[in-house]
Amino acid sequence: MIDIPDQISTLWIAAASAAFLAKHFLADFLFQTDWMAAGKEKPRGWLPPLAAHAGVHGAMTAALFLAVAPPLAWLGLADAILHGLIDRLKSLAARRMRVTPRQAGFWWLFGADQSLHHLTHLGLAILLAAAGTPAA
């Protein structure tokens, strides 16, 4: 059961938010290989590279929860699934709209994708901070 206290430590929410921002930068950019980035956008054969990319996100989220609240490490799987769904929907929308990086529509989709990932991380950061906040 996830128990959110009435008040969450400001320090914990700041630290958890920063941790998820760093995790996202690492997993979505630095640790994403060319195979993942190009492969997840293909009309066929997209599942293995997308699963690998989303798996990196999930593993890093699980690691954050393992450090603070091990019973909540399963949220890594939830993050991986959500991340994969968001990325796949963006890919399908880009293909349907036939947009490229030279068009504004591509960047609108990229912005929506990143915003949804950050919204996911906001929720996860709240849960991580709640788990780390000492009981009153």
Question: What residue ranges belong to the model's regions?
Answer:
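Hydrophobic alpha-helical transmembrane segments
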Residues: 1-136
